[in-house]
């Protein structure tokens, strides 16, 4: 797994985990700002790394373990902010529960939490999602343009998604949904001295209802932040300055 680092001479550390169907450069706009102030670590997740097109996505658990191993190898014992979006939020949450490194603050942006449903139901959901994305992979840009509103996604953004869909494997698509829906979390999560935030856009409120309920039950100290006029995972590309300011506000607050 390739790990990209920026601003390594800075003191405060931020880890950014990208969502599915994009690459690590999803964070391009905020990286140009963050690297001037922070040491930023961005993994290129297996299956979504254009430099390693023969790799497949493994699992939420395995990636979290590999990231922990990398941090220990580089003698990083504390992370000031761990951010993950959607699939990346699943990995961030799993990493947080491992307690292998001190995470002072965590943001789960539209994070997918493990379904609390019977096994057969979760597999049916995974099959539905797999088929939907696979059809997009086959149909390419023309199908994406018909399926997504041009008011929310520009032509360039749709071309980017089509590019990613073109090189990722069907195995990666399947494992992404199967793992994000069913990764294993500890039954009891110990108290955390930092802050936990769950972000979601008002346009995805219904889709995130189960995830929000999960966080309320298993992480009762979570702060829920709803952003108006936003969909799923749209802040990094559409509102990078606002996103960076949210990061600063979270890290700089006195505990």
Please describe what each predicted stretch is.
Residues 202-207:
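Acidic catalytic loop of the alpha/beta-hydrolase fold
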Residues 192, 198-200:
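Short beta-strand/loop motif that positions the catalytic acidic residue
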Residues 227-242:
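Catalytic histidine-centered segment of alpha/beta-hydrolase-like enzymes
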Residues 6-53:
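Conserved HGGG/HGGXW glycine-rich cap/lid loop of the alpha/beta-hydrolase fold
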Residues 83-92:
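Gly/Ala-rich beta-loop-alpha elbow adjacent to hydrolase catalytic centers
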Residues 117-119, 137-190:
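Conserved alpha/beta-hydrolase catalytic His-Asp/Glu region
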Residues 97, 103-133:
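Flexible "cap/lid" loop of the alpha/beta hydrolase fold
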Residues 41-83:
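Active-site loop/oxyanion-hole signature of alpha/beta-hydrolase fold enzymes
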């Amino acid at each position: 797994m390739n790990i990209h680092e920026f601003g390594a001479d800075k003191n405060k550390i931020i880890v950014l985990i990208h969502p599915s169907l994009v690459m690590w450069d999803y964070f391009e706009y905020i990286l140009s700002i963050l690297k001037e102030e922070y040491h930023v670590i961005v993994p290129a997740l297996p299956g979504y790394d254009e430099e390693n097109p023969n790799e497949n996505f493994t699992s939420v658990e395995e990636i979290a373990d590999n990231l922990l191993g990398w941090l220990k190898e580089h003698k990083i014992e504390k992370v000031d902010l761990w951010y993950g979006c959607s699939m990346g939020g699943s990995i961030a949450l799993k990493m947080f529960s491992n307690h292998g490194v001190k995470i002072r603050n965590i943001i789960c942006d539209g994070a997918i939490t493990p379904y609390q449903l019977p096994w057969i139901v979760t597999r049916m959901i995974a099959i539905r999602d797999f088929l939907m994305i696979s059809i997009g992979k086959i149909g390419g840009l023309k199908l994406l343009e018909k399926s997504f509103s041009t008011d929310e996604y520009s032509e360039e953004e749709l071309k980017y998604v089509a590019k990613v869909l073109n090189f990722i494997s069907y195995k990666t698509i399947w494992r992404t949904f199967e793992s994000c829906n069913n990764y294993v979390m500890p039954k009891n999560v110990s108290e955390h001295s930092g802050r936990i935030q769950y972000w979601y856009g008002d346009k995805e409120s219904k889709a995130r209802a189960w995830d929000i309920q999960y966080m309320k039950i298993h992480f009762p100290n979570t702060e829920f932040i709803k952003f108006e006029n936003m969909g799923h995972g749209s802040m990094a590309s559409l509102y990078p300055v606002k996103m960076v300011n949210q990061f600063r506000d979270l890290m700089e607050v006195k505990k």
